[in-house]
Amino acid sequence: MKSIIDPAALFIDLGAQKRPTVISVVGAGGKTSLLFWLAQLFQSGGRRVLITTTTHMFLPESTWPVIFCRDPAMLPRTSLSSPVSFCFHHWKATQGKAKGFAPEAIDALTQRPECDVILVEADGSRGMPLKAPDEHEPCIPQSSCCVIAVMSGLLLGEKIGAENVHRWPQFADITGLTPGTTLQLSDLVTLVRHPLGAFKNVPQDCRRVWFINRFSHCENTIAQSELLKPLQQHDVEAIWLGDIQEFPAIARRFVN
């Protein structure tokens, strides 16, 4: 267990030495907040960041510029020059969200020399704290060098069902749980390790980071021997525990 002081440690977890660095975030319980935090982290290190999605995303309350276009790979150079910017396909007024791009469009964007870091929200969760992927999910660009699977610790020790888990039928199939069951850490470990679970559709040779958000709310329910199983079995390269709304956002980090 290590407390995070030097962000360079996180850059290693994320495979951020690769240029461009494409990081896709999946799961539920803090994806968008994590994207914003990562953008600030990379910007503070002198990297230029573009934030986008392969699904739908609420427009940010931010001073960072927002770009709408049909094909991000065809954007003029000046559109990609901001320290941090958002890029979407179009605005969906009925949903109050911006629609993003197909994963292939983001893969094409990586060929642009102006691109340094591309952060992708690659999954939807309807605002719920936990989910399992449907057949068509998640939508991860093949150019991703890292995928972060987010889960909220708020539900650990709580009764779960369709009211607080997105894609409940898929989640129940993977974990074997029934409605009203109390969620245990071992159930999250099962979701991480299952081939149709949290890291479904992750490209080959892609780094995998498991992030339990809102960790302070469930710290007493975390058994380290259970937590580290995905790391010991090489299902993930790193495990982060923290709260993206607090400081430090990543309080603990486990690596092999």
What are these regions (language model features)?
Residues 27, 54, 89-92, 212-216, ...:
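Structural motif
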Residues 82-85, 114-118, 146:
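Loop/turn-to-beta-strand initiation segments
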